[in-house]
């Protein structure tokens, strides 16, 4: 029997409010994190992801009090990321109610952190978030893809998508799996906030190169987009924000639509 696919709302939090932008830019207010978290948990979300989107860029700690408040109103698995740089940071977040920690910039700066976290907290606790953007300045180090006009590679971006690393996302995904990541949260910056659908090419490429679960993120504008990414890739879960925050769709409706298309979710 195939494993059920997971539907995961995402709270991008900045200064204590949930926000949403397009391609990681031009963010606008989307509501209160605690209220939205409770709503999604009550509606039947499989998990919840909370990302403090400016913690790394501003070199500050994540908002632990907010994490604790959110954890107190939900009864589903809870992943928290943003500004986690050390074992102590991760421990604090887990003690404040998170079930998993997500690391992004810190894993690029210090890959051994992934291994250390896995050894202490277990693989099932560790999510490595990979933010990716197409880069058309390629060289021999990169796995290139032919575009209509020019070849490109999938580049890993850090600091909330604001800084390129020159790292090939395919090679990086394999590396974090080897280091002990339990799953990968894969966000396409090219698709983020556009509501034009998930980045099928990127998602498929990463899924085909790792064995750990991959969560697709960026671009969801309808339940049809979820159907498409589940049918065209081996992704285990989808992350969505805009369609839930602005009440375009409820989680019940999404799961019903997926069931009608033969996609099994956790009811």
Please place each PLM-identified region on the residue numbering.
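Structural preference for beta-strand elements that scaffold enzyme active sites
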Residues: 6-10, 47, 75-79, 100-102, ...
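Conserved, mostly hydrophobic/aromatic
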Residues: 12, 40, 48, 80, ...
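Conserved anion-binding
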Residues: 13-15, 19, 98-186, 190-191
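Short, acidic/polar
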Residues: 29-41, 85-91, 165-175, 223-226
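Glycine-rich, proline-tolerant flexible connector loops at the mouths of alpha/beta enzymes
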Residues: 47-66, 105, 185-196
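Alpha-helix-loop-beta-strand connector modules within alpha/beta enzyme cores
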Residues: 58-81, 116-131, 195-222, 262-263
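Catalytic cores of alpha/beta
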Residues: 78-79, 84-101, 201-238
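C-terminal helical cap(s) of enzyme catalytic domains, especially alpha/beta-barrels
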Residues: 113-121, 227-267
């Amino acid at each position: 029997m195939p494993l059920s696919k997971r539907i995961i709302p995402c709270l991008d939090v900045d200064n204590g409010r949930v926000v949403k932008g397009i391609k990681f830019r031009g963010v606008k207010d989307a509501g209160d994190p605690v209220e939205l978290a409770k709503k999604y948990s009550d509606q039947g979300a499989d998990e919840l992801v909370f990302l403090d989107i400016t913690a790394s860029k501003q070199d500050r700690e994540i908002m632990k009090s907010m994490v604790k408040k959110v954890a107190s109103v939900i009864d589903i698995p809870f992943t928290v990321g943003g500004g986690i740089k050390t074992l102590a940071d991760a421990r604090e977040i887990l003690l404040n109610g998170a079930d998993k920690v997500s690391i992004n910039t810190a894993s690029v700066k210090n890959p051994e952190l992934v291994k250390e976290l896995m050894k202490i907290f277990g693989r099932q606790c560790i999510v490595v978030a990979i933010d990716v953007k197409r880069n058309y300045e390629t060289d021999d180090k990169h796995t290139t893809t032919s575009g209509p006009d020019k070849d490109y590679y999938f580049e890993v971006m850090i600091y909330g998508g604001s800084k390129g690393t020159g790292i090939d996302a395919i090679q990086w995904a394999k590396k974090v799996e080897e280091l002990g990541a339990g799953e990968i949260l894969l966000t396409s910056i090219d698709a983020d906030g556009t509501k034009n659908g998930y980045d099928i090419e990127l998602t498929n490429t990463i899924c085909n190169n790792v064995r750990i679960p991959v969560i697709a993120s960026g671009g969801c504008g309808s339940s049809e987009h979820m159907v498409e990414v589940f049918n065209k890739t081996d992704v285990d879960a989808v992350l969505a924000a805009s369609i839930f925050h602005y009440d375009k769709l409820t989680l019940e409706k999404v799961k019903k639509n997926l069931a009608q298309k033969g996609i099994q979710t956790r009811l």
